C-alpha cells in the first residue's frame, strides 16, 4: 500500500515539474511558492535529489537585495492568476530582483528542509549546503532586522 502512495506522490511531482521548479497545483497555483517549494523539496529528496536542489536554486532567484525572499516567484506568464506581478509592482523597490515576485513572504521553512536534505545525503550534499546557506542566512537576517 505504501508503494502506491509513493507512486502517486511521484506522479504529482513529475506532472507539476516546470523546467527547474515544481508548481504546487496545476491551474490554481501556476507559479513557484516559497514554502511550498520547501515541502516539495522534501518530496523530491526521496526521488531525485537534483530536483530537490533545483527547487532551492530556482526559488532563490527571487531573493531581494535586502535578503527578503518573497512568497511567489512569477517564472512564467498567466492571464488568469490574480494578483499577478503587475499588481505587486515590486520593481519600485530598490531591493527587488530582476525576477518578477510578490511583495510578501511566508514562514521560513527552507532551513529545516536543508537540514533534512543534508541528514539524508550527508557529505555528498556539503557543497550544496555551502552554496545555499548564505542566502538562507540573509533571509533570516531580513526577518530579524526588518520584521522583528
Model region roles, listed by residue range:
Residues 33-47:
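Conserved H-X4-D acyltransferase segment
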Residues 1-32, 53-54, 58, 66-72:
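Low-complexity, Ser/Thr/Pro/Gly-enriched N-terminal "stalk/linker" regions
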Residues 31-34, 104:
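Short, solvent-exposed loop/helix junctions and linker helices
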Residues 29, 41, 99:
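Generic anion/oxyanion-binding catalytic loop in active/binding sites
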Residues 136-137:
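Hydrophobic alpha-helical hairpins/lids featuring a short glycine-rich hinge
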Residues 49-130, 144-148:
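Helix-terminus loop motifs that line ligand-binding clefts
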